[in-house]
């Protein structure tokens, strides 16, 4: 599914500063040389001076620099990239996961099953920017986060953000932000007396679009938490989710907060702990053994917490169904969480919570320095391939690459490979497709066909509405 937004709707969104469209498109002003998010608080430009772009990278490629007031590089990504199963959607998910930084455009093309020239042509034709420009925009954003939230030396930040040289880093920052790295750091809004050191972790604001039902996500994570790699602590409404992460260059530990100062009581009453975030972010802190993993770690957290979803489109569609309408009205912004590690989730979906804890205790790599109850990494597929039966077969398929569940995997191919494994039932396969592959349009076996068709293309969200029962409803 592709959001087709006509020019009149776009300009009206800019004129009314409509945050619902942040990340769905960007606009640039010819007379100022600046590009913005639709909700930018600056004076509305004349229609004749406005240009529209599908991505920040396209605006940058056209010579526009990021607005310092609205920081368009910090908005949630378009929900289309989660929905779409075509080459452009898959490419955008992989670029977000850092594939171009690690493997270059040839590596991206191999993963997509196309030539590098075909990938360049398709992305440029639709998005106005090729894979290099898209990755460059992402590197610039990562660098800004590190410059403005840590006291790391500029040289370390350049390589941590994925730049090949300090000169390339300096040139990109000047082009995108019209500031030197030092000036960009000095322009950071102050949230305290001093920036944290790397040992204290990197503070993050994980932006989301529209209302966000944080309590439902944290309820699910608490129910699923596996001893040794995850924990959820604190009172409901003010919980902290913590987990270990296996990343391309090293390991990480993240803490994500449920509470947010912009939270509001859910419609229809309910306690203050059943908060709906009304647009904004989740606060997080990330500890990494290798800072080159920052971009990948952030993208995996965004998928786990479903932060790039479009709750307005989801709620409009599902709210038209009589069965779901009262649930949607009472729970705006309900999300369909994904997975921080798709391979890990597939194994957990198969063996269950207790089985996963057993695998962690037996095969998991022990952290060099335990952090409270977080003591292990979940075992890599190769470490589990000797397990008997279906778990071993699943692990072997993941390890040898015959089954791919990464951000850019073809969902239909992955489902076919899962179904070919002995002992995986249809419900487990559907759950893996929904959570590990991040498919927003999955129906579990047993739902009435007519109802399921009415929920397209958001069937995964419909199932979350039907499955989740907050304590007051139980």
Predicted features along the sequence, with ranges:
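HhH-family (HhH-GPD) DNA N-glycosylase catalytic core used in base-excision repair
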Residues: 1-474
